Amino acid sequence: MTVEYRLAPEFPDPYPVEDSYAALVWIAEHAADLGDQDRILIVGASAGAGVAAGTALLARDRSGPRLTGQLLIGPMIDDRDRTVSTTQYEGMPPWDRNSNRMGWTALLGDRRGTDDVSIYAAPSRAVDLSGLPPAFIDCGSAEVFRDEDVAYASALWAAGVQAELHVWAGGIHGFDFMTPDAAISRAARAARDGWVVARHLSSR
């Protein structure tokens, strides 16, 4: 199912994650009619992957529906603008440091980069990642989100959470959407599909 959560700046934090969590609760309550209640996977790309990661944290902290996995494609998860990759690709399309600041400001307003930011809005701020569902994280090597995504995967491993990380050589942000027939895009889709099948669709 696709969740049409409300978008910033008209609906800033916490609307996107709260909408996504409400949808997750509804899906879990109707899982018998929709599919398998024991195999609920959350997926997102870019800002949507940040919402997915935040929703996974919220589900854990509210003892909400159990997720079997989180598939995060180029997730936007850190508002603090401190990594090497945020400066390394400044001025380079399709999404650079200025775009990133604009996006975070739309979501957080004047709170961007301050201590007054929730882990559900910016999951990289979470200190405790234990108890989260297994994760698949990928990004391009030539994108702003690279370092925060690698750091998040490392933090998941440190917390004892199963995670699979792919950094696609030469990939820019959204490379698989812009060049779907390129070899790198086909490889990325195959890796994602393989993870979903192996962990969530195979018979138990």
Describe each model-derived feature in a short phrase.
Residues 1-204:
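Alpha/beta-hydrolase superfamily serine-hydrolase fold, recognizing
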